[in-house]
Structure formats: structure tokens, C-alpha cells
Design a protein with these regions (language model features):
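Structured beta-strand/loop patches that form or line metal/cofactor-binding pockets in enzymes
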Residues: 1-59, 65, 350
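Conserved, mostly hydrophobic/aromatic
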Residues: 32, 44, 66, 114, ...
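Metal- or metallocofactor-binding catalytic centers and their adjacent structured scaffolds
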Residues: 39-126
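Glycine-rich, aromatic-flanked loop segments that form ligand/cofactor-binding clefts
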Residues: 105, 109, 115-158
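Metal-dependent enolase-superfamily TIM-barrel catalytic cores that perform enediolate-based chemistry
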Residues: 135-256
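Shared catalytic-loop signature of beta/alpha-barrel
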Residues: 227, 233, 244-370
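Extended hydrophobic packing segments that form well-structured cores
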Residues: 371-389
Length: 389
């Protein structure tokens, strides 16, 4: 049993949307195929992943360091104790050989994307959906049957009107979502408040709204937005400041009583531990941590991050992985987390879930396909198959 090849391709997202900090006109993502010599149903088992969204393709680092380390290792050293499947933890350790501590983002996304693709192969070899494999290893065998999903929407778009924004949110509600998120910080405060008011007007009483500032604000603007947003009773106010400015985040937390959310731009367990130690976040007020596993060294390291925040008194229900894709869905279901993000209608083939996915009252039933389940996304799977051909 061995990995015979690992391939990467950079794919443009071709999107004209923007948040408060940048647009996605140049954004790319790395698609990875981990090709094994294991055969199932007459075909080699291939693990797939991509590096989520919001960070550019990272194939150069993969090809220069991480892929050669895996392919150059003794194949038996990459297997589990009974030599019946690959061991993602051992493969992660091989990729980390001769790597200096710190500087995580330079490598965490490249490593994490390959590692998640390995997990896809592991689950396929076990003939189980990944969420079930993860539940067995990391959640006492308690496998969820459905996951709460919210929409990461409300992006700024060219010539968008407030009515356009309301119409978008109505579509999400009609599709079965009960929580939606929108961007703030890309317009003057008064205009953003009008946008928030407009969305709140169309939400039913049992629906929730969150806002995302994408780390845009310095101190004065962050506190001004916190004051203006306080009356709306938001599910959370996301990334109000630089992701590593824990002192400012703690000040905002003292000033803003409703929940805060952050973490998608933290790429190591140590960064997340520093967040919960020094960032002033409050598990008793439903604050949320949003690490993106493929961008933060993968699932093995994410399990270590989960264990770390649990030691600091955080429940798993406070964890909502960033990403809006099948990977975060499987991880949320397997670990028993609070929920997953969704990107309907944006990022082309890379947004959303399986073609037959249907939400009911905010929840998405988990599939039974072996692996992550990319095979259920026809447009994305065709891209992956072309890479592996």
C-alpha cells in the first residue's frame, strides 16, 4: 500500500465579489489529488481536497517540499499500526520534517490541503464517509446525521442595491437556511447600518443574522461599529479587527455584549490558544471560533486545536469551521461541532455542497458516500478527475 503520486493544480475562482478588505478577482485555489495503489471497485483510490477559499493556490511549496517528502518516505512508514490504511498523522509529521517553528501560513495551507486529501483516501479505503471516520477517532463514535449550516453571503458586488441584498437573503431563506451572514466595513458606517436594517426587516422571527468585517477595522472604527450594531441582536460580529490583535479584540469584547467570532485567519494551534487566553472571548456568551482546517495544517492538527480549546473551557458547539464546502461539513459532523458555513451561488464549483443537498430548517443531512463526498458535486468532481487523469 503506497501513495504513487500527488498532483496539484491552481484553479481561478473568477469572482467579482468583494468583502471590506479585498476583492476576489485574482483569487485562486489549489486542487490536490493523492493517488494510491489501493484499488476499490476496479479503480485506484484517489483522495481529493482543495485549499478552501480566501487564500491563494500554494502549489509551489507543495511541489518544492511537501510532495517530495511524502513520495520519498518509506511507504510502510506512512501506514497505520496494522498496515491496513494510511496514517494522516504520520504523513503530517513527514511533511513537517526540517521545518522551522513559527511562520505558519507560509506552509500550513499547502500541508493542510494535502493532509485533508489523504483523509479522503483513508475514508474511501475504509469504505466510510469521512464524517463517520472522524467521529470514530475523535468523538467517541458519536456520528451526527445532520449539521447546522449558515450562509456566508451578503457580499459587496458591483452596482448592488439594498433590494438586491434583500432578494439574496430571501433566496437563502427559501432554500431552507435559518441563519445568514452579510459583509460590513466596505461602505461608510451609516450605509452599512442601513443594509443591516434592511436585511433584519425581511428575516422571520426565528432567523438569525451575523455580520463579518473581515478584519478591516482599527480601534476607533471597530468600537463605532460595535456601538452601532449592538441594538440588532446579531448572532455574531465577525473579525472586527486584525486577527492577531488580541488586545484590541479583548477591548471590543468588553464593550460589545453580543457574541463575537474570529479564527479563520489563525493557522496554528498555538495561535488559537493565544486567542482564547488573551483575546477576551467568552464561551458563556456564545462567541465562536472559526479555524479553517485545510488552511491550518489539516484535520490531525485541527483535532489538537479542538482539544486545546476544550482544555480552556470551550464547548465544541462554539466551533464553526470557515470554508463553506464538503470538507468543513464532514469535519463539523465528525467532531460534533456547532455547524458549518455555506457559500451558495459564489465561488463557482468550489462553493456549496453536493448537487442533491437539501436543507431543512437550517440543517443539512450528512451523506453516506465514502470519503469527503466530492463525487456528489459534479462540476467540482470533473475538475478533480481531470487532475487525476
Amino acid at each position: 500500500m503506497r501513495i504513487v503520486d500527488i498532483r496539484e493544480s491552481a484553479i481561478p475562482l473568477k469572482s467579482d465579489i468583494r468583502n471590506s478588505s479585498f476583492d476576489f478577482s485574482e483569487m485562486t485555489t489549489s486542487v490536490v489529488a493523492v493517488i494510491t495503489d489501493v484499488v476499490r471497485d476496479g479503480k485506484p483510490v484517489i483522495g481529493f481536497a482543495f485549499n478552501s477559499t480566501g487564500r491563494y493556490a500554494c502549489g509551489a511549496a507543495m511541489r518544492a517540499r511537501f510532495i517530495p517528502r511524502i513520495l520519498g518516505a518509506d511507504p510502510r512508514s506512512l501506514l497505520d499500526e496494522v498496515q491496513e490504511n494510511f496514517d494522516p498523522g504520520k504523513i503530517l509529521a513527514v511533511m513537517m520534517q526540517r521545518e522551522k517553528s513559527g511562520g505558519h501560513c507560509e506552509r500550513s495551507i499547502a500541508i493542510g490541503t494535502i493532509e485533508v486529501a489523504v483523509w479522503d483516501a483513508v475514508a474511501k479505503i475504509a469504505a466510510k464517509p469521512l464524517h463517520r471516520v472522524l467521529a470514530e477517532r475523535y468523538n467517541g463514535g458519536k456520528s451526527a446525521t445532520k449539521v447546522f449550516c449558515y450562509v456566508g453571503g451578503g457580499w459587496y458586488a458591483p452596482d448592488q442595491t439594498v433590494k438586491d441584498l434583500q432578494d439574496e437573503m430571501r433566496r437563502h431563506l427559501d432554500a431552507g437556511y435559518t441563519m445568514v451572514k452579510m459583509k460590513v466595513g466596505g461602505l461608510p458606517l451609516a450605509e452599512d447600518v442601513r443594509r443591516v436594517e434592511a436585511v433584519k426587516r425581511i428575516l422571520p422571527a426565528d432567523a438569525q443574522l451575523a455580520v463579518d468585517a473581515n478584519s478591516k477595522f482599527g480601534r476607533e472604527e471597530a468600537l463605532a461599529y460595535a456601538k452601532a450594531l449592538a441594538p440588532f441582536g446579531l448572532r455574531w460580529f465577525e473579525e472586527p479587527c486584525d486577527p492577531l490583535d488580541f488586545a484590541l479584540l479583548a477591548e471590543i469584547a468588553r464593550y460589545y455584549d453580543s457574541p463575537l467570532a474570529t479564527g479563520e485567519n489563525l493557522f496554528s494551534t498555538q495561535d488559537v490558544e493565544n486567542l482564547v487566553r488573551f483575546g477576551g472571548l467568552r464561551p458563556d456568551r456564545n462567541d465562536v471560533i472559526q479555524v479553517d482546517p485545510p488552511q491550518a495544517y489539516g484535520i490531525v492538527q485541527y483535532a489538537r486545536t479542538v482539544a486545546t480549546v476544550e482544555r480552556h473551557g470551550w464547548p465544541r458547539s462554539a466551533l464553526f469551521p470557515h470554508g463553506g464546502n464538503q470538507m468543513s461539513l464532514a469535519i463539523s459532523g465528525g467532531f460534533g461541532l456547532g455547524g458549518a458555513e455555506s457559500y451558495p451561488g459564489v465561488f463557482g464549483a468550489f462553493g456549496g455542497f453536493a448537487d442533491d443537498a437539501k436543507l431543512e430548517r437550517g440543517y443539512l443531512a450528512l451523506h453516506d458516500r465514502p470519503g469527503i463526498g466530492f463525487e456528489g458535486q459534479s462540476a467540482l468532481y470533473s475538475i478533480m478527475c481531470a487532475l487525476a487523469a
